[in-house]
Design a protein with these regions (language model features):
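C-terminal, low-complexity/hydrophilic appendages and adjacent surface loops
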Residues: 1-47, 53-56, 66, 82
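Sec/Tat-exported extracytoplasmic proteins
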Residues: 62, 66, 221-225, 258
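Structural detector for internal amphipathic alpha-helices that build alpha-solenoid repeat scaffolds
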Residues: 95-112, 121, 129-144, 154, ...
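Amphipathic alpha-helical scaffolding segments comprising HEAT/armadillo-like alpha-solenoid repeats
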Residues: 112-124, 144-157, 177-189, 209-222, ...
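Extracellular/periplasmic ectodomains of large secreted or surface enzymes and adhesion receptors
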Residues: 24, 56, 64-68, 77-122
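Structured segments of extracytoplasmic/periplasmic soluble domains
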Residues: 48, 61-69, 209
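C-terminal substrate/ligand-recognition segments
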Residues: 22, 28-42, 69-71, 90-110, ...
Length: 263
């Protein structure tokens, strides 16, 4: 409901100047709020000089906690499911999972082109999680990642779906949307609802470029309704619902009749 209202107000041009950032395509890399004086977290203090010290302290504490607890938020969902094979992901990863080097890479995302070599290097790793974050870092650079075109094109053939999807977003962002959207469109055919959801999220991110996938999106929506009606598919129902919502919103948007009642 909150997102619906934000979209409605944004479409009407009624968001205030300190609120319109909520509808931006990306969020700030760092965020810090005074929740006592700003309970709705509208005034980001992260870049103000007087708050830099506390910002760095909180960041260090957060990263230390993520390393100590082996935070699996750094691992794509598909990877967790595949590796744990129905067991508890934490049990699967807790033994040899070291989040620190991944966290160091992730922290570079959104912080400028000076980190492009780190993303390119990660994209060539034998570890798909590194490749994923390398591609995600290049996607965040937009046109500034154009020098990585050949590397990204080869990554479109990566054996791991979530790596292909991240590379697809990056290739779209440097001006080659047809190739990227083709990969994402195929992702909607996946037998894994996790992959379908991820592909739909990236299609949302590439916006108007997703028009190449309109026919496939309409087919996917019909199939997702069937999953929602199948009582034996209870585990995937929520993912199917979110995927369908993404695609229905995107189809409406691409057809020029954005549905402001969509989540």
């Amino acid at each position: 409901p909150i997102r619906q209202e934000l979209r409605r107000l944004d479409n009407l041009g009624l968001l205030q100047s300190n609120e319109d950032w909520l509808m931006e395509d990306s969020v700030p890399v760092d965020e810090l709020y005074d929740t006592e004086t700003d309970p709705h977290e509208l005034n980001n203090l992260a870049q103000e000089a007087e708050h830099l010290e506390i910002m760095e302290l909180l960041k260090r504490n957060l990263f230390s906690w993520m390393v100590e607890t082996k935070d699996l938020g750094l691992v794509p969902e598909y990877e967790m499911i595949e590796k744990s094979k129905g067991g508890a992901p934490y049990d699967t990863f807790s033994g040899n999972f070291d989040p620190k080097p991944i966290l160091d890479l992730v922290d570079k995302i959104g912080r400028g082109k000076q980190h492009i070599d780190s993303f390119n290097f990660a994209l060539q790793s034998s570890n798909p999680v590194y490749r994923y974050w390398g591609a995600t870092g290049l996607a965040a650079l937009g046109q500034n990642a154009v020098e990585s075109k050949e590397l990204l094109q080869s990554t479109l053939n990566d054996p791991v779906p979530y790596v292909r999807f991240a590379a697809s977003e990056a290739i779209c962002n440097i001006g080659y949307p047809r190739k990227g959207v083709e990969i994402l469109s195929k992702g909607l055919d996946s037998e894994s609802v996790v992959n379908q959801l991820h592909a739909s999220q990236i299609l949302m991110a590439v916006g108007k470029n997703a028009a190449f996938a309109l026919p496939k999106m309409k087919i996917a929506i019909d199939n997702l309704y069937k999953i929602g009606a199948d009582e034996s598919q209870s585990y995937d129902k929520h993912r199917a619902w979110y995927t369908r919502e993404n695609l229905e919103y995107l189809v409406s948007y691409l057809n020029g009749k954005e549905n402001t009642n969509s989540n």
